Amino acid sequence: MENSEQLVWLHGEPQATGSLKSTAEDFLVVEDLGFQPDGDGEQVLVRVRKRGCNTQFVAEMLAKFARLPLRAVSYAGLKDRHAVTEQWFCLHMPGKETPDFSSLELEGCDVLEVIRHRRKLRIGTLRGNHFALVLRQVSDRNEVDARLAQIAASGVPNYFGSQRFGRNGNNLEQARLWANNDIRVKERSKRSFYLSASRSAMFNQVASARLAGQQAKTVLCGDALQLTGRGSWFVAKADELETLQVRLDAGELQITAPLPGDDELGTQDDALAFEEQALTGQETLWSLVKRERVEPARRAVLLYPQQMQWEWQDDVTVAVKFWLPAGSFATSVVREVLHSQQDIDIGA
């Protein structure tokens, strides 16, 4: 399900409106690697603050400056150009001197830190991101205040943002054409985008159905449950439901929904039947990820922002800060707060 307006809200549809982003400075994203760089090694980590530049462009410029092939430059996640972001890039430079990046001139970008590291930075290496947003022209301060408090206590749906599906859902449109053999997709990056969009749409559809049935916080027989903060999961057995529900309520466990691939969904019994029913209508996308032998995975249905705080600058402007784990979308938080005049989706 790619249209965010069709997705169910956890706290009911917001009544307030506002502007998510008037300037790039109203959307600040700072990467959290989750580890301290080693200080030595074959890799050179470069922390860059960028405005108006997308991740791939900066990677290309760093490669050119350091006289490296583009394949020698990596990063942990993509960041949108319509924001101020602090992001790490990794340059593979064995046996080479660390470049003097003080002479790098790139409009909208500043090098903040350079340090050696032993391991390559790869997609998904990231622990999470710190977000600092400013919501302006808020129509109802009391409503937004109450919803922010609800979110801090109870979380939000862990939906993929519309950015995942491309402009006007183009990635999904192309994925369906590809699935039906109406087009050929040779570029590896496009194949990845289309497959990712397909799985994300199916996840959103199952997660939304779970919320619609008031079952986002109720363990079903056969559910795939994730240990909070961990990627591993296990299947809920019928004789364990009461105990598992207590652990879920205590925050130790999270219910997951599928990122379908070429194998089974992972759930069993009641949960499997629910997910298969929820995926009705997505046969084309499901057949594509099976055909392309994509590895299946699971993702938590709910997202719990950490370190959440907010401060009103005046009656119509609120600054909101929080931390999200890698792969989560800040706009999944914002869509539970208010209807935004601009839908800027920045995840990592």
Curated annotation (Swiss-Prot):
Top-level division of the source organism's lineage: Bacteria
GO molecular function: RNA binding; tRNA pseudouridine(13) synthase activity
EC number: 5.4.99.27
EC supergroup of this enzyme: isomerase
Gene3D superfamilies the record matches: TruD, catalytic domain, TruD, insertion domain
Keywords: Isomerase, tRNA processing
Function description: Responsible for synthesis of pseudouridine from uracil-13 in transfer RNAs.
Protein name listed in UniProt: tRNA pseudouridine synthase D
Protein encoded by which gene: truD
